[in-house]
Amino acid sequence: MADSCTMTTDLNIPLFERAKAVIPGGVNSPVRAFNAVGGTPRFVRRAQGAHFWDENAQQFTDYIGSWGPMILGHGHPEVMAAVQAAALEGFSFGAPTEREVVLAEKILSLMPSMDMVRMVSSGTEAGMSALRLARGFTGRNKIIKFNGCYHGHADALLVKAGSGLATFGASSSAGVPQDVVKDTVVLEYNDVGQLEEAFAQFGDQIACVIMEPIAGNMNFVRASVPFTRRIRELTREHGALMVYDEVMTGFRVALGSAQSLYAQHIEGFAPDITVLGKVIGGGMPMAAFGARREIMEKLSPLGPVYQAGTLSGNPIATACGLKTLELISEPGFHDALHAKTGRLMAGFKAEADAAGVPFSVDHQGGLFGFYLLPELPSTWTEVMKTDGARFNRFFHGMLERGHYFAPALYEAGFVSAAHTDADIDKTIEAAREVFKTL
């Protein structure tokens, strides 16, 4: 078993104590601390393919993949070679390079909704910049976001729903003044009625609606086609922009990202601004936002909307991202990934049913989610009904058997091209044992 070390021999424990003395909570991103599930985080020493090894040299099958970027698995030889070659040429220049132009051209070839793209270093930075651009382009201040959707930790987006439309949102973090979020309206995801009410009340004041097509911080909730269509209709009618946050879904759920899937159901569908991250960096700090030319030309140095970054378009990150996008563009890549992820989820569902455990699953491409609920939820309110204590037992049961899932109830999971049938079979077998204990 992967968690067989005793309290005196588990090397993760003293390392976590050292970390807590010098890093707030012992981690550099809160979910890594295991606060939601209890226990000690696994400190990773190395990773290869679909696996990583912790400080005890214990192997785990990895179903978070650095929270999404590692679509090819860890240490893909062609990606490693590209990164090593780029590193030999220099780490960072603070000047443009041909490679960032090639990466931009590659992204635009896969995303027809975008004429131009700007590189940044994180999804938070991309989302924050997209909002500034939307406000600068429209000359308006109000934005609409949805409860349960995460768009990074920019102040204006750290918002939870208030008691009604008239109250707007309420800050969800200390250090974020109410004045900063006073123009953020928070609505229920997939609620067309609330959406229409908001536009009826504030339509000529709304700069943009920002949304995730699949809300991965609600585990896995799809935006319904009618909901997505209505957002597109209302934004066009009122001169607002539709900002599509594909940081998690971009190039992972399909080669054309989630917007290509919705375009199959909504004639002429395209968002105004798209936010990208994770996969486009292949594991390096890289994100981007893009839109049609008239919007992007509002950005400095062409226009009045300021945005800059010391490490934007970093040469090593662009090499990693470019090689990743080249490899996932191979014919059949996403079909195979979707089938592999579906096999994992079907196996989980069958074993949960056999054990009499309420369970629902969904997946798209290499992204998946599951709930200890009899039916898939469609809103944050429904997601909140899932059994947290039972999930924690499931998480630790799988961890003990060497399978690493998100250490939080509401986080999506990720399958990579490196996961083999044998990996998935072993994971399903472990789930069979764990479901029997729930």
Curated annotation (Swiss-Prot):
<dbReference type="Pfam" id="PF00202">
    <property type="entry name" value="Aminotran_3"/>
</dbReference>
<keyword id="KW-0663">Pyridoxal phosphate</keyword>
<dbReference type="GO" id="GO:0008483">
    <property type="term" value="F:transaminase activity"/>
</dbReference>
<dbReference type="InterPro" id="IPR015421">
    <property type="entry name" value="PyrdxlP-dep_Trfase_major"/>
</dbReference>
<dbReference type="InterPro" id="IPR015424">
    <property type="entry name" value="PyrdxlP-dep_Trfase"/>
</dbReference>
<protein>
    <recommendedName>
        <fullName>Glutamate-1-semialdehyde 2,1-aminomutase</fullName>
        <ecNumber>5.4.3.8</ecNumber>
    </recommendedName>
</protein>
<keyword id="KW-0963">Cytoplasm</keyword>
<keyword id="KW-0627">Porphyrin biosynthesis</keyword>
<feature type="modified residue" description="N6-(pyridoxal phosphate)lysine">
    <location>
        <position position="278"/>
    </location>
</feature>
<dbReference type="GO" id="GO:0005737">
    <property type="term" value="C:cytoplasm"/>
</dbReference>
<comment type="pathway">
    <text>Porphyrin-containing compound metabolism; protoporphyrin-IX biosynthesis; 5-aminolevulinate from L-glutamyl-tRNA(Glu): step 2/2.</text>
</comment>
<comment type="subunit">
    <text>Homodimer.</text>
</comment>
<dbReference type="GO" id="GO:0006782">
    <property type="term" value="P:protoporphyrinogen IX biosynthetic process"/>
</dbReference>
<dbReference type="GO" id="GO:0030170">
    <property type="term" value="F:pyridoxal phosphate binding"/>
</dbReference>
<dbReference type="GO" id="GO:0042286">
    <property type="term" value="F:glutamate-1-semialdehyde 2,1-aminomutase activity"/>
</dbReference>
<dbReference type="InterPro" id="IPR015422">
    <property type="entry name" value="PyrdxlP-dep_Trfase_small"/>
</dbReference>
<dbReference type="InterPro" id="IPR005814">
    <property type="entry name" value="Aminotrans_3"/>
</dbReference>
<keyword id="KW-0413">Isomerase</keyword>
<dbReference type="InterPro" id="IPR004639">
    <property type="entry name" value="4pyrrol_synth_GluAld_NH2Trfase"/>
</dbReference>
<comment type="similarity">
    <text>Belongs to the class-III pyridoxal-phosphate-dependent aminotransferase family. HemL subfamily.</text>
</comment>
